């Protein structure tokens, strides 16, 4: 603004010079002053242009920084969505694993119960093999020696089959327990036993 005031002052001086028809010295002085004002104006203009270029450069840098920041925010949003999706998947997987663990725990408990039951049965079998089976084998051998009957254990259910090895001949046994009473079958088998033994 000061430069424009100086120009206005110089212009008024020139007008007064022309109007008053003053001396040449005053004209030179005013022309010199006019040149100084023009130089100052040009310097000011150069400075203003330089400042304007700097401001434009700064604006471009700020705009680029803003664009970079927006891109980073966008990338951050995408990464956040990916992390949230991953977190949701991890939560679902955790739920599936917990359900699977619960199922496996139940199965383990069932297996432990089965194992305990098997151990109990094994103990009972051990008792049977040490006490019951030897005595049953002894009784079966005794019955075989007394009755001389060789049993067919592979016959169909409900049938009593075997061979009685009597004193003179072997006689087949073929009885249907669904049509005959137990008493009849027992009496018949005992009737085969030789009384002279």
From Swiss-Prot:
UniProt similarity note: Belongs to the SPC24 family.
Function of the molecule: Acts as a component of the essential kinetochore-associated NDC80 complex, which is required for chromosome segregation and spindle checkpoint activity. Required for kinetochore integrity and the organization of stable microtubule binding sites in the outer plate of the kinetochore. The NDC80 complex synergistically enhances the affinity of the SKA1 complex for microtubules and may allow the NDC80 complex to track depolymerizing microtubules.
Region (Interaction with the C-terminus of SPBC25) residue spans: 132-197
Modified residues annotated as Phosphoserine in this record: 11
GO CC terms in record: cytosol; kinetochore; Ndc80 complex; nucleolus; nucleoplasm; outer kinetochore
Coiled coil region boundaries: 33-131
Chief localization: nucleus
Domain of life: Eukaryota
Sequence segments annotated as region (Interaction with the N-terminus of SPBC25): 1-131
GO biological process: one example: cell division
Protein name in the entry: Kinetochore protein Spc24
Signal sequence interval, chain numbering: none
Biological source species: Homo sapiens
PANTHER family referenced in this protein's UniProt entry, alphabetically: KINETOCHORE PROTEIN SPC24, PTHR22142
């Amino acid at each position: 603004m000061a430069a424009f005031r100086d120009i206005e002052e110089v212009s008024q001086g020139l007008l007064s010079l022309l109007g008053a028809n003053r001396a040449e010295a005053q004209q030179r002085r005013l022309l010199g002053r006019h040149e100084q004002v023009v130089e100052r104006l040009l310097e000011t203009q150069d400075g203003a242009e330089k400042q304007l270029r700097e401001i434009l450069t700064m604006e471009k840098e700020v705009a680029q920084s803003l664009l970079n920041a927006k891109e980073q925010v966008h990338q951050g949003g995408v990464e956040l969505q990916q992390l949230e999706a991953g977190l949701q998947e991890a939560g679902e997987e955790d739920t599936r694993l917990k359900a699977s663990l619960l199922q496996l725990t139940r199965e383990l408990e069932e297996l432990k119960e089965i194992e305990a039951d098997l151990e109990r049965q094994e103990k009972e079998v051990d008792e049977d093999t040490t006490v019951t089976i030897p005595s049953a084998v002894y009784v079966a051998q005794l019955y075989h020696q007394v009755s001389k009957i060789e049993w067919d254990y592979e016959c169909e259910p409900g049938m009593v089959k075997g061979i009685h090895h009597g004193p003179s001949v072997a006689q087949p046994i073929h009885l249907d327990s669904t049509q005959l009473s137990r008493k009849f079958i027992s009496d018949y088998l005992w009737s085969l036993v030789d009384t002279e033994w």
